Structures are given as structure tokens and as C-alpha cells.
């Protein structure tokens, strides 16, 4: 991804979400809870950037549902027909979109706030599938007393596995390998 593309995207978005956010950044980095007003500002910035990206796919007028995820992250779910092109094969296009989007939001705000882009609930469905896969693998690891390796996953999905099993005292999880073959290993205690 070229720095020029990122800078061009930021210039496109800048007038729509003009502002300086050092106070929010300072409070967030200090671990303070952000106010509803500050969270609304972050959401406005993120939605403006997402709409700018969507305009390149002629989808900037698509509805965007905004809600809070289980881990406190802001989730923006683009809901419109014919957006499969934004998901891509096995979600790879959506993963690339997420990386670019996160970089743009971080650059604009001056700090990294967790904002997840979803399309038609794809990530939500995938999250359920990954959590189910993790639970099944944990049960198998406990039953067989052997380590169980899951298939290679991106960083987001590996994190979902670790989160899904962190409350299970009968297993430990860790990641092995390097991308694109990095995967989670589940070991019975």
C-alpha cells in the first residue's frame, strides 16, 4: 500500500471530519473512559473515512449500522445488496479494507482506536464460526490429551480463538508459524 494513496485518501476525508483530537487521544492512551460525545466524534470520523472508501466502489450511500462489539470495539457494518466484492474470497478483500481503513482512522485521530468494518454481517458470522471451531478443538484437545492445531488464520481470527478460550481453564492457546501459515494451537493443561 502506497503512502501516496493513504495521503490522498486522508486529503479527501479531511474537510469532512476536520478537527484536532489530541485531548481524546491523551485520555484514551491514559486508559480513561471516553465520554459518549468523544465516542460519537470517533464514530463520525470513522464513518466519514469509510464512506470515502466506499465511494470508490460506488457504495458510499450504503447504510452503515454502528454498534459496540463484545470487546468494546466500534463495529461499522455496511448493509447493502451486491457488496460481495468488498468481502472477496475467504474475506481477504475485507481484511485488506480493514487494514487500510484502520490506518486511515489512526492517522486522522492521532491514535489507534479499535474500529471494525464488516459487510453484511460477514465478520459476525465468521466470528461465530471461529468461536465454534475453537470450542470443538478445545474439547478434542481435552478428550485426547493432545495438542490441536487449527487451520491458518489471519490475526483477527486468531485473536477470536484466544478470546473464545481464555475462560477455559482446561486448555492453553498460543500461535505458531508465520503468515500466511500462522495458526493457533490448543493444548490441554
Identify what each model region corresponds to.
Residues 1-189:
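RNA-contacting regions in translation and RNA-metabolism proteins
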Amino acid at each position: 500500500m502506497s503512502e501516496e494513496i493513504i495521503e490522498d485518501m486522508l486529503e479527501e476525508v479531511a474537510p469532512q471530519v476536520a478537527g484536532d483530537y489530541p485531548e481524546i487521544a491523551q485520555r484514551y492512551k491514559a486508559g480513561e473512559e471516553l465520554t459518549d460525545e468523544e465516542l460519537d466524534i470517533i464514530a463520525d470520523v470513522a464513518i466519514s473515512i469509510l464512506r470515502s472508501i466506499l465511494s470508490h466502489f460506488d457504495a458510499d450511500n450504503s447504510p452503515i449500522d454502528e454498534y459496540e462489539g463484545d470487546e468494546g470495539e466500534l463495529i461499522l457494518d455496511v448493509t447493502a445488496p451486491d457488496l460481495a466484492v468488498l468481502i472477496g474470497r475467504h474475506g481477504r478483500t475485507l481484511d485488506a479494507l480493514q487494514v487500510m481503513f484502520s490506518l486511515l482512522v489512526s492517522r486522522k485521530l492521532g491514535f489507534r482506536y479499535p474500529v471494525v468494518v464488516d459487510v453484511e454481517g460477514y465478520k459476525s458470522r465468521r466470528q461465530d464460526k471461529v468461536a465454534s471451531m475453537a470450542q470443538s478443538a478445545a474439547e478434542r484437545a481435552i478428550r485426547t490429551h493432545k495438542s490441536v492445531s487449527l487451520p491458518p488464520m489471519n490475526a483477527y481470527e486468531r485473536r477470536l480463538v484466544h478470546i473464545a478460550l481464555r475462560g477455559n481453564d482446561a486448555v492453553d492457546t498460543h500461535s505458531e508459524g508465520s503468515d500466511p501459515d500462522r495458526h493457533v494451537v490448543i493444548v490441554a493443561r
